[in-house]
Amino acid sequence: ATAAFAENAKFDDGTILADEGSYDLVVYGDSSGAVTAAVAAKRKGLSVILINPTGFLGGMSASGLGATDFLGQRRTFGGIASEFYEGINASYGEKHVRSFEPHVGEQVFKKLIADAQVQVLFDEKLNRETGVEMDGNRIVSITTLSGKTFHGKMFIDATYVGDLMAAAGVSYTVGREPESQYGEDLAGVRRGDTRPRLHYGQGDKDHFVAEVDGYVIPGD
């Protein structure tokens, strides 16, 4: 795979900036998932570019959502997620930090990217109208609003809204699927479900307790 680098394209923190080219993996997004996917693939030896539609890394975790739904089981963290929290701990000089400031989270994400030498392009939004080239049901390349084109063997949509998937014609559902679609007894709308969950102890707070239905045909 080849990649054309922009001149002097490197942040002070070591983040490598990139330009158009062909890659094993093209990751589109700015979320924590975008960072971890790009880092994991790069560590596996793939050529990777992270196309970031905004000017910062880390999505909500670097934008104010610095509290973690952590229930006391340290073993639930592993892999790059564990490395992220190790970086948070090191930043504060403490152990077991689970709430952090946005700028600290962003710096840890940047370090993960820089250490893995992942190439990043900031402020490049997908052209959702004509920017996805397909070969059958496979994405061949994507083009941004600025006109830059990126070819890849694989693509990952790591946005929160699924812009790349939608532009590629991937089917999707808005809201919850009915229980019958995939045979999931916990799918669909839940009403008055009070089955105990040990980590809450007061019933299932993830389910609706009022009769809320998001479909035109109730119960669909």
What label would you give each PLM region?
Residues 37-38:
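Generic hydrophobic/aromatic pocket-lining and core-packing "Φ" positions
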